[in-house]
């Protein structure tokens, strides 16, 4: 276990599990370098080339969707608008990477025959079903990833060998927070603290070097209070910023302007705050010992149930995703976790004291990430294929190989 660089530490990922030197390299040089195929719990792979699903009569339609370089949440919003539905009438088993080619099931309430044309989105099949797709029906995802421009091949091989022995931390990965603008968790924490001014400051006054010049200019205008000019300057794809600014132009206060952002996006901010807290707690748990060896006070998952660890019980260590109603560990594990929460100025109750639709309940997430069927070939480029359980981030595995100091420059 070695200390991670400042960017990772800012996201709560304080450590690497492996102590190998950085391999370097670039992922996602093009979307086809990062393929994601959903795996259902019955083992069915929703493959890019197509999938066979047994239809069942009911009030839902399952759609096989392949998207290239398209944001999952924005796809759902666009699909709902095109079909004249509410966004809650469309469900997914999980959010997939944007800068990638991904294949998954999307379900729509009712019988759907005609689907809209959406750039970079293919609909490869649809089936009547008796229930919506849901996270509980998803085992995970199969990844096929190309790492180009590997600078130190021997370091890449050493890292992959080390991953077979190390207990890999199940961090929430870079894309949960952003690499060009790593602020999703900061926006979420501002919401949880009811800090409208802080939310505005993060949204418009924190400007990062890899943003486009158009975005930088628009943020500067907004930060100076020139809302109308900023609204005109932001490109149309900046949904959140434009929604907030439209309200400010009409004379709204900062909090109600923030509430104009689509609910699904506000929820992503809250979940990013939860993810950041989880990463910090997981890092603190790594300081107490290997993640594959429970210690006194740990919460563990045994046969699908979360309980407190007792000697000889076994089970997988889990760490709370902090929110309303979550149980905390005991003993020295609890002491370490309470210290983190105090430093962050957040209590589990804060997640319940939110407007309806933004309340977030706690859950539990396994402390270690276990890749299945890991295979690779190393020629001019490194090609990896592996399966991760639902919620696992491929970039968490890849960061152990590449060990980037500036993730964006490596394609993360």
From Swiss-Prot:
EC number: 5.4.99.27
Ranges for domain TRUD: 167-370
GO MF annotation terms: RNA binding; tRNA pseudouridine(13) synthase activity
Active site: 97 (nucleophile)
InterPro entries for this protein: PsdUridine_synth_cat_dom_sf, PsdUridine_synth_TruD, PsdUridine_synth_TruD_CS, PsdUridine_synth_TruD_insert, TruD_catalytic
Catalytic activity: uridine(13) in tRNA = pseudouridine(13) in tRNA
Name recorded for this polypeptide: Probable tRNA pseudouridine synthase D
Organism, scientific name: Pyrobaculum neutrophilum (strain DSM 2338 / JCM 9278 / NBRC 100436 / V24Sta)
Gene: truD
